[in-house]
Regions:
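Compact mixed alphabeta submodule
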Residues: 151-192
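Flexible, charged surface loops at secondary-structure boundaries
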Residues: 79-82, 137-139
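"Short basic amphipathic alpha-helical interaction patches in structured regions
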Residues: 100-107, 158-164
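A generic structural signal for short coil/turn motifs at secondary-structure boundaries
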Residues: 95-98, 154-156
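A generic structural motif
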Residues: 92-96, 172-174
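Active-site ExK catalytic segment of metal-dependent nucleases
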Residues: 54-55, 105-106, 146-148, 167-169
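Non-catalytic accessory regions used for complex assembly or targeting
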Residues: 1-81, 87, 91-93, 101-120, ...
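Aromatic/basic-lined ligand-recognition segments
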Residues: 125-163
Length: 242
């Protein structure tokens, strides 16, 4: 495996071979997520226990990202019982940009990962994003991805600092917590009630659970700062084998 920058809490704060902005943005992220009333109890607890993993993306160099993601997936296999998340911090813009800019950037990162993926797309995952069972995959693993950005003003739970922060959660961490199971439905309901209180907005209409036949997974990857349905086609394109 080539160069990889898979970091834990300590690495994000003190590594001397990474850009200076990384520690600052990790501090911003931590200040939000460690707020006692932060809606995602999973994220808060995992951060405290040093179970989350992170990396960074410089504006002009994405080359380490595929290997870093593979390192994370390998870590998941070592201790599958730990419900880890992976958060990618993108170098902040010199001036804050509109939400659509960050959404476009988000999809470019996912597309880049897909283009660099040398492993076979999972057989059980459709290749058409308009299929209700489609979801992003990398390294042979289905993964839930979601964007957070400084342009979110209403949805404060999605504003984690000056960086675009992309969260990646392998589908395996949701085993036993699926939305159509009592435990999963209860957990989601509790989190969504807390999110509603933080954001002072109702649940976004594109938020649902994986497997809902009326749901399109890609639409909840980067929701709006509002309660408007996301329209149009998915920006993601499955690569064509030559």
């Amino acid at each position: 495996m080539g160069e990889s920058y898979l970091l834990d809490n300590e690495g994000m704060k003190n590594r001397d071979d990474i850009p200076n902005w990384v520690a600052k943005e990790f501090n911003n992220f931590s200040n939000v997520v460690l707020e006692p009333t932060f809606p995602c109890y999973f994220g808060l607890t995992a951060l405290k226990k040093n179970e989350l993993r992170y990396s960074f993306l410089s504006r002009n160099d994405w080359s380490h990202l595929p290997n870093t993601m593979l390192s994370f997936l390998e870590l998941m296999k070592e201790r599958p019982i730990v419900r880890r998340g992976f958060f990618l911090f993108v170098e902040p813009e010199r001036e804050e940009q509109p939400l659509e800019y960050y959404r476009d950037y988000f999809w470019k990162v996912l597309q880049y990962l897909h283009e660099k993926d040398n492993q076979t797309w999972p057989k059980q995952i459709p290749k058409d994003p308009d299929h209700y069972l489609w979801e992003f995959s990398f390294g042979g693993e289905p993964i839930f991805a979601f964007g957070n950005a400084p342009a979110y003003k209403q949805r404060k739970t999605r504003h984690l600092g000056n960086s675009l922060v992309i969260g990646f959660q392998p589908r395996t961490i949701f085993d036993g917590l699926e939305g159509d199971r009592p435990k999963g439905a209860y957990s989601r309901q509790m989190v969504r009630e807390r999110v509603k209180k933080w954001d002072q907005l109702p649940k976004h209409p594109n938020i649902s659970h994986y497997g809902d036949i009326d749901h399109r997974e890609w639409k909840q990857y980067f929701i709006g700062d509002d309660i408007e349905l996301i329209k149009g086609k998915c920006p993601f394109h499955h690569k064509v084998k030559l």
